[in-house]
């Protein structure tokens, strides 16, 4: 993407204000107070900018001068675009600035200096240096290199396919898919975006395709970026084998016809390679419903992968998922698309990745471990984004199973208004609070005897005041009005927290020793710290020597940060001899995935210790919601005092 500086914008404003009227170079030089040579160089930059951003043409006529040939609608849009760029660049957040920088570098075929980037974004060179480092590290995920050439500047090097992948996943930099989508669309005219949207909808309707909203948006952005890259003479390149395989599919004919309808709108020709590339994205797109075609679920590896996944998660969770047909159907549909994407070398974004890792850390990391085995067994590369989606499938199955077979809290209802009102209240509670099992509806006079006989009662819900009751209780009206529903929800939450408080010792305290605690560490990189902690576990006889290298490999597959400055690196349980936990705090927070981490628990936990593992992850989840407590731990300098904080 071509940068234009403030002076060049002023020249372009002049051209826009005098459409179809010739202006001589001297006019520009006088207006912006520079030499004619500088103006001629600026006009070349402006011409490149216009070629990329619009259909406008810069016309030069010897003896007459220069004029801008542009449609009225486009002139208005371009004026607004220049105005918006000028003011919004001063107001961008750090992450948004990084998005702009990454996009500009990927779209710019020419080198650009860090000084120019800093000037464009109105920040100092040191801020830009940090941004460029983050962008450089992110580009490595796509086998792209940010090369710095002396006296020329910075340029992204790598093949076009990887650049397209990076552009499609650019939202990873700021973890805001909606903002990124609007950002890319803003680079095009409204009618261009609308026309592509209409054509993709038409394609869906005509061929009964049921893309998810996420896939639809992805296809729209891929198509728009394809147009821009073709205009920049940056076409995609595919292997003859890939071309031949895709061109046989009916989806190729659909895509080719769709692109032909777009050609007159954008005044370009789509090469066959581009039609094949877009077809790959259609084939790899996620659908809301299974496609009823002969090609559906045709992948021979699919049943093996689904079977392996369900078997291992069932074993590790000690829950039988084989009878949940909703789960099996969902996994078949989802993993069929995943395998398609992998075979076509397509990447996928998951805007919920970090939220899922924080909400369901135990299940997510369990599935990552299972996928590591699946990837090795079937020579696949299923990424963490897919692990997060699979986590949701299994979490839904767990909630279905718990809803039908187990409950969290046993309750008794005390109602003073007879059986009819008691049953109404019972029905309301059971319908609205699935975590409550109402064991009985009784009179106040019978309550004490009932509690003596049923010591496992967790709470009493009463319509009248109660005295001398040892079990937690709450008073509500028989009709359980909306305000009381909130009150009851808060009461149930407090019960959970008080249960947590009764556990006076963290499970992790039972699985560590002072010799495995390292406070105020200074580490250059998270991999170095992982190796240090794994080595400590090995030297104490808890793990095999290979645990360290496999923990780093596992970290590369998916960063183990879980929020609130906490990370939980670990490796496959087959390298563990005895369950143990090594702990480190950091003098300075360390970059860890998409956040900075100060507290690290290296988990070496055998799968056989199921009860302990569940309790451990419950504690970690609790810790991630207690920033003040985490800060207290990370500031501690004495090992024994640190451990005493975990015994309360």
Curated annotation (Swiss-Prot):
Record SUPFAM superfamilies: Phoshotransferase/anion transport protein (SSF55804), PTS system IIB component-like (SSF52794), PTS-regulatory domain, PRD (SSF63520)
A GO term for molecular function: protein-N(PI)-phosphohistidine-sugar phosphotransferase activity
Function: Positively regulates the expression of the mannose operon that consists of three genes, manP, manA, and yjdF, which are responsible for the transport and utilization of mannose. Also activates its own expression.
Name of protein: Transcriptional regulator ManR
Ranges for domain PTS EIIA type-2: 510-648
Sequence ranges assigned to domain PTS EIIB type-2 in this UniProt record: 409-500
Gene Ontology BP terms: phosphoenolpyruvate-dependent sugar phosphotransferase system; regulation of DNA-templated transcription
Any Pfam family hit: PTS_EIIA_2
Family from the record: Belongs to the transcriptional antiterminator BglG family.
EC number: 2.7.1.191
Activity regulation comment: The regulatory activity of ManR is modulated by phosphorylation and dephosphorylation of the various ManR domains. It becomes activated via phosphoryl group transfer from PEP, EI and HPr on the two conserved histidine residues in the PRD 2 domain, whereas phosphorylation of the EIIA-like domain on His-570 by the PTS EIIB-Man domain of ManP inactivates ManR.
Residue stretches making up the PRD domain: 187-292, 297-404
Observed phenotype of the null mutant: Cells lacking this gene are unable to grow with mannose as the sole carbon source.
PTM-bearing positions, type Phosphocysteine: 415
Alphabetical keyword list: Activator, DNA-binding, Kinase, Phosphoprotein, Repeat, Transcription, Transcription regulation, Transferase
Modified residues (Phosphohistidine): 222, 281, 334, 393, 570
């Amino acid at each position: 993407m071509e940068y234009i500086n403030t002076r060049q914008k002023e020249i372009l404003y002049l051209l826009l204000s005098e459409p179809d009227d010739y202006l001589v170079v001297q006019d520009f030089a006088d207006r912006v107070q520079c030499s004619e040579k500088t103006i001629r160089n600026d006009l070349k930059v402006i011409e490149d900018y216009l070629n990329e951003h619009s259909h406008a043409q810069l016309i030069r006529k010897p003896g007459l001068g220069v004029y801008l040939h542009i449609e009225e609608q486009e002139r208005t849009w371009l004026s607004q675009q220049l105005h918006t760029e000028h003011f919004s660049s001063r107001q961008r957040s750090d992450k948004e600035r990084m998005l702009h920088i990454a996009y500009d570098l990927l779209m710019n075929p020419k080198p650009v200096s860090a000084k120019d980037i800093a000037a464009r974004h109105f920040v100092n060179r040191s801020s830009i240096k940090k941004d460029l480092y983050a962008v450089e590290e992110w580009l490595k995920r796509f086998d792209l290199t940010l090369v710095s050439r002396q006296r020329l500047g910075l340029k992204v090097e790598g093949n076009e396919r990887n650049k397209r992948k990076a552009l499609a996943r650019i939202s990873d930099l700021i973890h805001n898919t909606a903002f990124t989508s609007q950002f890319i669309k803003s680079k095009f005219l409204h009618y261009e975006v609308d026309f592509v949207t209409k054509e993709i909808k038409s394609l869906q309707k005509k061929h009964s395709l049921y893309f998810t909203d996420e896939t639809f948006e992805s296809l729209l952005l891929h198509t728009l970026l394809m147009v821009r890259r073709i205009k920049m003479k940056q076409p995609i390149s595919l292997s003859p084998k890939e071309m031949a395989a895709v061109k046989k599919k009916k989806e190729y004919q659909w895509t080719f016809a769709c692109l032909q309808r777009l050609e007159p709108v954008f005044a370009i020709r789509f090469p066959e390679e581009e039609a094949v590339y877009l077809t790959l994205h259609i084939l790899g797109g996620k659908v809301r419903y299974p496609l009823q075609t002969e090609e559906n679920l045709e992948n021979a590896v699919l049943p093996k992968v689904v079977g392996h996944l369900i078997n291992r998660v069932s074993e590790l969770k000690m829950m039988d998922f084989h009878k949940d047909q909703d789960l099996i159907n969902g996994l078949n549909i989802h993993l069929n698309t995943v395998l398609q994407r992998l075979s076509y070398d397509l990447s996928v974004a998951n805007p919920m990745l970090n939220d899922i890792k924080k909400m369901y850390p135990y299940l997510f990391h369990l599935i990552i471990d299972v996928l590591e085995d699946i990837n090795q067994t079937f020579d696949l590369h299923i990424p963490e984004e897919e692990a997060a989606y699979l986590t949701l499938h299994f979490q839904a199955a767990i909630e279905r199973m718990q809803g039908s077979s187990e409950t969290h809290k046993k309750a008794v209802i005390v109602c003073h208004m007879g059986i009819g009102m008691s049953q109404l209240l019972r029905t309301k509670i059971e319908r609205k609070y699935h975590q409550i099992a109402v064991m009985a509806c009784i009179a106040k006079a019978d309550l004490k005897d009932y509690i003596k006989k049923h010591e496992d009662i967790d709470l009493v819900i009463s319509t009248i005041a109660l005295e001398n009751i040892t079990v937690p209780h709450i008073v509500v009206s028989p009709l359980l009005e909306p305000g009381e529903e909130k009150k009851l929800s808060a009461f149930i939450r407090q019960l959970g927290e008080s249960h947590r408080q009764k556990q006076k010792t963290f499970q992790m305290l039972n699985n560590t020793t002072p010799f495995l605690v390292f406070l105020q560490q200074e580490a250059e990189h998270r991999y170095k710290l992982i190796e240090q902690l794994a080595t400590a576990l090995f030297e104490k006889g808890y793990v095999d020597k290979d645990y360290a290298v496999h923990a780093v490999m596992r970290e590369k597959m998916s960063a183990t940060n879980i929020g609130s400055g906490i990370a939980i690196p670990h490796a496959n349980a087959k390298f563990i001899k005895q369950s143990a936990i090594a702990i480190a705090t950091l003098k300075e927070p360390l970059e860890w995935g998409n956040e900075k981490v100060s507290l690290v628990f290296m988990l070496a936990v055998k799968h056989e210790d199921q009860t302990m593992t569940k309790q451990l992850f419950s504690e970690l989840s609790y810790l991630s919601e207690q920033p003040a407590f985490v800060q207290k731990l990370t500031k501690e300098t004495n090992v024994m005092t640190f451990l005493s904080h975990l015994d309360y």
